Regions:
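Short, conserved active-site loops that position catalytic residues or coordinate cofactors/metal ions
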Residues: 1-20
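Active-site catalytic loop in hydrolytic enzyme cores
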Residues: 22, 31, 35, 51-125, ...
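CN hydrolase (nitrilase-like) catalytic-core segments centered on the catalytic cysteine
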Residues: 22-45, 114-205
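Short Pro/Gly-enriched beta-strand edge/turn motifs at strand-loop
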Residues: 43-47, 76-84, 163-165
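Short beta-strand scaffold segments in enzyme catalytic cores
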Residues: 47, 61-64, 96, 162, ...
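Short Gly/Pro-enriched turn/cap motifs at secondary-structure boundaries
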Residues: 53, 88, 173-174, 230-233
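Residue-level detector of high-confidence beta-strand sites
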Residues: 61, 71-76, 193-202, 210-212
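A short C-terminal boundary segment appended to hydrolase-like catalytic domains
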Residues: 213-233
Length: 233
């Protein structure tokens, strides 16, 4: 919920209605990101946002906005107990990999990365980079996301990128604190960093993290790695 500051204007309506108020901005935000992708000739993976589908139910979704003007939606499949209790969110059903002009990618929102089966299904579809947008309020919650993300990189012989929200929002109910450290993780083998960390942001600090990844190294790993997780399952 990277756009959570917009929810402050709905505080007086209660948490369940405030999140639906935030959902009113989702289509406009998607359009703006699509315009940015075209204008700057880049592919953009948005953070997640609340979204009301045709069934009238509320979901947590995000968008891949390609530089060619097309977009795809991804959904959070597993919602947390707090998301159910406070906001009435529902788990989605879509689990897809996406083709881009850079790589075949997958996206899992926050809690979803803690379920190994999801990334395994995407790895079977040829996923090379897994992106994990997340929002965690405590270091405990952040550690769950981070440690699981690093495990997914090893298990699936892919790169994993996590990007989280930082800072405090004292005027937004149920979203007042966030803790994160964004990073780029790799498999752990000879061609990669020994600790599986390609790049890391400063803890709990707003910043831009830039990193290159070599997809050819993944192909070599699949065939010549010292261990071969994908083949040996």
């Amino acid at each position: 919920y990277f756009n959570a500051p917009l929810m402050s204007k709905y505080n007086d309506k209660g948490e369940s209605q405030a999140i639906r108020g935030l959902a009113k901005y989702t289509d406009e935000i998607r359009e703006r990101f699509m315009n940015l992708a075209i204008s700057y000739n880049i592919n953009i993976i948005t953070g997640s946002m609340p979204y009301v589908k045709e069934d009238g139910l509320l979901y947590n979704v995000g968008f891949l906005c390609r530089r060619d003007g097309t977009y795809e939606m991804y959904e959070k499949l597993h919602v947390t107990p707090d998301e159910i209790k406070s906001w009435g969110l529902n788990g989605g059903k879509l689990l897809n990999t996406f083709d881009t002009d850079c790589a075949k990618i997958g996206v899992l929102i926050c809690y979803d990365v803690e379920f190994p089966e999801l990334s395994r299904l995407m790895a079977d579809q040829g996923m090379q980079i897994l992106f994990v947008p997340f929002l965690t309020d405590t270091q405990n919650a952040y550690s769950r996301v981070r440690v699981c993300a690093q495990a997914r990189a090893i298990e699936n012989e892919c790169f994993v990128v996590i990007a989280g929200s930082v800072g405090n929002l004292p005027r937004v109910h149920n979203m007042d604190i966030q803790y994160a450290q964004s990073g780029v993780f790799t498999p752990c083998d000879f061609a990669f960093p020994t600790d599986g960390k390609r790049a890391e942001a400063t803890p709990n600090t707003e910043m831009i993290l830039v990193s290159d990844v070599d997809l050819d190294l993944l192909n070599e790993l699949h065939t010549y790695g010292s261990v071969r997780n994908l083949k040996d399952r």
